[in-house]
Design a protein with these regions (language model features):
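Cell-envelope/extracellular polymer assembly enzymes that use nucleotide-activated donors
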Residues: 142-145, 175, 316, 331
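Acidic donor-binding segment of Leloir-type glycosyltransferases
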Residues: 165-209
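Long helical/loop segments within the catalytic core of UDP-sugar-dependent glycosyltransferases
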Residues: 193-229, 241-326, 358, 362, ...
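Acidic donor-binding loop at a coil-to-helix junction in glycosyltransferase catalytic cores
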Residues: 326-332
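Catalytic donor-sugar/metal-binding loop of nucleotide-sugar-dependent glycosyltransferases
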Residues: 333-351
Length: 521
């Protein structure tokens, strides 16, 4: 009887244990399912937020449409007026239009020359030597998040991780996020292999969704970021190892209205071919003279796409990056200025890969030109409000510099073409639409403008080696490439405004020149 009772009790306990185990497993599965659903919901929320960050802060400054209703009305009315004048007098209308274009061209050239001359004085740059940077106490350094978006470039990650690990910053205060598209399996695999078990690196997968742009990925990473400061690097970058410390020092001691520090950019393969030499000179002027010139004039700074260092709170306040703008950097720089913040230019160099392939270069440059036009159109949707926020002079500087960059590329080739046609064919039509005053203005624009551009290139190259001086002399050929890129940008601005043409990297064949070389701006 006792044995039967014990057997019955054992059977009951066994059944009860089985039921409890089954319930526990179901509860575990439910929690796992709930966690997965919560994670999926969190991912979806972060994705939508990464697209809408700017829309929530400034819905009128999102570049999801090329022209606002008001701008379309101006275009239609302006086009109608020009058409009516053409009907009344073709020659007079063309003469006036050509004269207006010449004056606009001269104004843009004058602005660039003024910025160049101001930028030659390196006092506009924030300069911190390596010894001072290393002496800055670690205890005063803030936490830092480094965002590195990448797509379709698995070959760069070995070098990338090596370059970022060389950054001299307390590891406990540093987090580095590699922002990768979730369906880019080859790049994800390469990144995870390169990162290994390095604690301050994390691979963040950005869900595949439109718009598939760098700024959307940056926003996705920013939402997860924990650092007080945020830096952006590209996947092929080789930053100055002390750049984070230097930027942190600047932002620690600067007034609260200094929200961003832009480091200078150069190339590690400047002498690979003629295109890379031209590109190097281009960067030398942009980061070495033109941006410092803007700093001295206290004008808006169109940021470069990498080596930007921000206060995270300010970045979130202004809406971060526009997910639809293909030059989100230039747009953000202007938006910071509109919000009352300033940008400094730091004399610390990040080396990039200079584009050495002609087709690849045109793709990249046309995206930049398209983005500059996008940016200007966005900020001119409400021109009177824009003027009130930043002032008349900064507004004119922004229009002539940001808008003038692609405009000069097109008009320079237009003037060259007109002069060539005139000297070869001397068409009677030119005599009718180009009276003496307009003709001489045009000649001044062509001869004087090209002389000024060539002079600035030669001056920028004078401290470099002879190969860059020769490239500067041959720069008129580079202007033809610029015109091609600007024309392509104008077409894409209408047909595919938010399309991000990927720049192919890894074409440098292992070049590794030192920061003190001609690559440095």
């Amino acid at each position: 009887v006792i044995s039967q009772v014990l057997a019955a009790v054992g059977l009951i306990l066994c059944c009860t244990g089985g039921v409890l185990h089954l319930q526990a497993r179901r509860e575990k599965d439910r929690r796992r399912s709930d966690a997965a659903a919560e994670a999926a919901a969190g991912t979806a929320t972060r994705l939508q937020l990464s697209i809408d960050l700017l829309r929530r802060a400034h819905p009128d400054q999102v570049a999801d449409t090329t022209f606002s209703v008001g701008q379309l009305q101006v275009l239609i009315i302006g086009g109608t007026i020009i058409a009516l004048f053409l009907v009344a007098s073709v020659h007079l209308t063309i003469m006036v239009l050509v004269g207006a274009v010449i004056l606009l061209y001269l104004a843009s050239l004058a602005v660039r020359l003024r910025l160049f001359r101001l930028g030659l004085d390196q006092d506009a740059l924030v300069q911190i030597d390596d010894r001072t940077a290393r002496a800055f106490p670690d205890s005063r350094l803030p936490t830092y998040t480094v965002l590195v978006p990448a797509y379709g470039e698995p070959e760069v990650f070995g070098r990338l991780v090596e370059n970022l690990r060389a950054l001299e910053y307390p590891r406990e205060k540093l987090e580095i996020m590699l922002l990768l598209e979730a369906d880019d399996t080859e790049t994800i695999s390469a990144a995870r292999k390169a990162v290994g078990d390095v604690l301050d690196f994390s691979v963040v997968l950005v869900p595949a969704a439109e718009p598939r742009t760098k700024p959307k990925a940056l926003n996705y990473g920013l939402i997860k970021a924990r650092g007080d400061l945020v830096a952006v690097y590209d996947a092929e970058d080789r930053p100055d190892p002390l750049q984070l410390r230097k930027a942190a020092m600047v932002l620690a001691d600067a007034p609260a209205d200094v929200a961003c520090v832009q480091a200078k950019l150069g190339f590690f393969n400047p002498n690979q071919n003629l295109i890379t030499r031209w590109f190097t000179l281009d960067y030398r002027m942009w980061f070495g003279e033109l941006l410092p010139g803007l700093v001295r004039l206290r004008a808006p700074i169109p940021l470069g796409g990498t080596s930007n260092h921000f206060r995270r709170t300010v970045l979130l306040e202004v809406g971060a990056w526009d997910a639809f703008n293909v030059t989100e950097d230039a747009d953000l720089g202007i938006r910071l200025y509109r919000a009352g913040y300033r940008t400094g230019v730091l004399d610390s160099i990040t080396l990039e890969e200079a584009n050495s392939d002609l087709v690849n270069w045109v793709k990249q440059r046309s995206r930049w030109y398209k983005g500059y036009a996008q940016t200007l159109l966005v900020h001119l949707r409400q021109p009177d409000r824009f003027r009130r926020e930043i002032g008349l002079r900064p507004l004119l500087l922004t229009c002539l510099f940001v808008g003038g960059t692609p405009m000069l590329a097109v008009l320079n080739s237009f003037f060259w073409g007109c002069v060539i046609v005139w000297f070869i064919f001397q068409p009677h039509f030119f005599r009718e639409v180009l009276p003496t005053l307009t003709y001489f203005l045009g000649m001044i624009s062509w001869i004087g403008g090209n002389a000024v551009i060539l002079y600035t290139w030669l001056l920028s190259a004078r401290r470099a080696e002879d190969k860059l001086v020769i490239a500067a002399i041959l720069s008129p050929l580079y202007w033809i490439l610029m015109a091609m890129a600007a024309t392509k940008a104008a077409v894409q601005l209408i047909t595919a405004p938010s399309y991000w043409e990927k720049t192919q990297h890894g074409l440098d064949h292992g070049s590794a020149e030192e920061p003190g070389s001609a690559a440095a701006a």
